Amino acid sequence: MIVPIQCEYYALEGLGQLVGNVDLVKANLNPDLEISKIVLVMYDSRTKISKQVADEVREYFGGRVCKQIIPRSVRLSEAPSYGQPITVFDPTSRGAIAYKELAREVLNE
């Protein structure tokens, strides 16, 4: 399972709840279920909270956190309203490039 997490405070709480739910599912339904990757999304390098969340997630999950971070981007938020993926809507945007790099990272592991 690949889990995206927004680099916001409440997302950390949600991630904690998700880990608990994954443990319940593993114990009762699917012992093979694992969080294989965590993707940091909506990262804003101008804010302290983004860095703090990224640091805490990396500290807890270690190597399961993808190196490629998806930045906060106006173009990324606009693409769905046009019914298009970012790679079609604006293929040269920072967000599109970040998602392409993330795909390469995940596929190469």
Language model region names:
Residues N30, G95, E105-V106:
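Short, charged/polar low-complexity linear motifs in solvent-exposed/disordered segments
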Residues M1-V74:
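Conserved catalytic-core segment of NTP-binding enzymes
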Residues E101-E109:
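C-terminal alpha-helix
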Residues A79-E101:
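C-terminal boundary of histidine-terminating zinc-finger modules
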